[in-house]
Amino acid sequence: MKWLCSVGIAVSLALQPALADDLFGNHPLTPEARDAFVTELLKKMTVDEKIGQLRLISVGPDNPKEAIREMIKDGQVGAIFNTVTRQDIRAMQDQVMELSRLKIPLFFAYDVLHGQRTVFPISLGLASSFNLDAVKTVGRVSAYEAADDGLNMTWAPMVDVSRDPRWGRASEGFGEDTYLTSTMGKTMVEAMQGKSPADRYSVMTSVKHFAAYGAVEGGKEYNTVDMSPQRLFNDYMPPYKAGLDAGSGAVMVALNSLNGTPATSDSWLLKDVLRDQWGFKGITVSDHGAIKELIKHGTAADPEDAVRVALKSGINMSMSDEYYSKYLPGLIKSGKVTMAELDDAARHVLNVKYDMGLFNDPYSHLGPKESDPVDTNAESRLHRKEAREVARESLVLLKNRLETLPLKKSATIAVVGPLADSKRDVMGSWSAAGVADQSVTVLTGIKNAVGENGKVLYAKGANVTSDKGIIDFLNQYEEAVKVDPRSPQEMIDEAVQTAKQSDVVVAVVGEAQGMAHEASSRTDITIPQSQRDLIAALKATGKPLVLVLMNGRPLALVKEDQQADAILETWFAGTEGGNAIADVLFGDYNPSGKLPMSFPRSVGQIPVYYSHLNTGRPYNADKPNKYTSRYFDEANGALYPFGYGLSYTTFTVSDVKLSAPTMKRDGKVTASVQVTNTGKREGATVVQMYLQDVTASMSRPVKQLKGFEKITLKPGETQTVSFPIDIEALKFWNQQMKYDAEPGKFNVFIGTDSARVKKGEFELL
């Protein structure tokens, strides 16, 4: 595959602007060589040049290219983001080499979360694959395309554990579970960075948003987070540490406050934990405008105070504000910030530039100028095959009454819904340099699959929403949602007439991509009413009804679950989304995705997640009792639990077999089950292993995911799946904030989702 190509592209530095003889060369990419090099470089730098390295600016209206040129000339820029073509990146690096005194290279960054030009499923969809090979594919292709555009760093992966679907940025992460998020994040870092971020087709990652951003109160963007240290370190911190242990070179610091202190000014978080406890050596980057926001947080009196607090707390690079360059010179002069503190921040920035290989070749990710693509958006630059394969694995079959799916290609199919033919929405949030016109919609995918065999009819049926306030919000900066001027009833009538002419109705419904994005928190997580009215009208036709969901968060679907004959969760599936969805609808691919977040029955249940603590009065549905932990107007559990997902075949899981009834601290126990495909077609499923610490010094979750394996079985085939359990799987942060495992009984649960499991047990001695 072209994205795995390891052939280097020779870059003749003689073709580039003249370089400083003593700065660039064949420097060994070792910590020792780096430290010596950076120490000498710092000695040559002025205060202003050191401060300039701490400035990360975005290309845009506030910073036009002409203004950036002057900043570069004066050594006032350390890195650039939001520029994504080789031509633009080359021009800026040329300016550094031609105009600046020391010629310290820029690095270039972008939000490449689920693809650069080829857009893969959103991270929440990727998590649904429960397949680390799929994560590796996304990471390698994304890095290849980003590096091929000249980028050196991505603001990814996002590893914020989120248990509140009201939060719009849940779409960017890997879901509610600590273990799954840690595993996915670690794998993404390794895939994107490859052997070294200095490699031609690798990029440096930036784990974000540190810390606990996914736990904002009320699921409201930019809100505060308040939690015990035990919950913080047991549930929310492990994914960040996993990404850093995998070698991530950067951390983006969160916008929220944590237990009363904004993360941007939290020296305990950024120094005591990140540097001292975890040994992180890379750079910390503030989120967009976060330093100036310390004033509004109420922890800085004025801009100068905000800069002082941020730098002393451990923020190395300032994103998208001029505060460091404007106020640090005076703070240094007055002694409120020491030269040692400035040098420490600048050293971290220079270190990552060295690790990127920029002091060996500042054009390392650009290649020779003559290799620049004539058309930066050329079809030949896409990786459609990989995108389609990964997208298929991300799809989750939620319901399939009477085997409504797969559909017959010879049928007359009505494709209905405001998202059925939306090229933009299928790509989802943070679609990087992806081009909407290159994406495949569900309507197009179905037409491609049917060909001349059957007939495909189409009606839009409804607007995404009829709420003018929401439309205005979504279209605040551009026309992201196109509104059909027809009346709602006129559109529904057309859809009903289309449905009546068909054998089956496929309704593509859910959210526009802007509804599941940064700054897109919702209090109502149902499908918008305009679409619910459409679904009701389609149901009334009596035709088999298949709902294809397009969304970036779990939705409350109690009514739709009752109405639909089949429901396929597709998230935002990316460039090849339409073809991948059609593959599943027609049975060319057997769905195998599993939910990485629980789907609540209503917003009133939130947060609903599988790994909750027990109570002194737990609810038992088999033995109802008024005085137990429950709602009297709603069921306790999720509509669709974590790890849930159906297939076109069926599987059985045997009883759990333990290799031993007891385990020593330096030993291990292996838990095994036999999984059998009891259906009539080949299929894959995810075997999931959960643990429960039955009695401990503090209340522990009712179960926690500690292992998973995706297996493919032919009809009638049986496979033994085994999970080794060691002491690390049993440890937790206790009331004394000691990380350890406690002796006693442990339950082992193994199944194909978090609710349907077989149980075993062992004792830790």
From Swiss-Prot:
Pfam families, A to Z: Fn3-like (PF14310), Glyco_hydro_3 (PF00933), Glyco_hydro_3_C (PF01915)
Catalytic activity, as annotated: Hydrolysis of terminal, non-reducing beta-D-glucosyl residues with release of beta-D-glucose
Entry EC number(s): 3.2.1.21
Protein's UniProt keywords contain Ribonucleoprotein: no
Chief subcellular location: periplasm
Leader peptide range in chain numbering: 1-20
List of catalytic residues: 287
Gene Ontology terms describing biological process: glucan catabolic process
Compartments where located: Periplasm
Keywords from the named record: Glycosidase, Hydrolase, Periplasm, Signal
GO molecular function, one term: beta-glucosidase activity
Gene3D superfamilies attached to this UniProt entry: Glycoside hydrolase family 3 C-terminal domain, Glycoside hydrolase, family 3, N-terminal domain, Immunoglobulins
Class of the enzyme per the UniProt entry, highest EC level: hydrolase
Gene Ontology CC terms, in alphabetical order: outer membrane-bounded periplasmic space; periplasmic space
UniProt xrefs under InterPro entries: Cellulose_Degrad_GH3, Fn3-like, Glyco_hydro_3_AS, Glyco_hydro_3_C, Glyco_hydro_3_C_sf, Glyco_hydro_3_N, Glyco_hydro_3_N_sf, Glycoside_hydrolase_SF
Family the entry assigns: Belongs to the glycosyl hydrolase 3 family.
Protein known as: Periplasmic beta-glucosidase
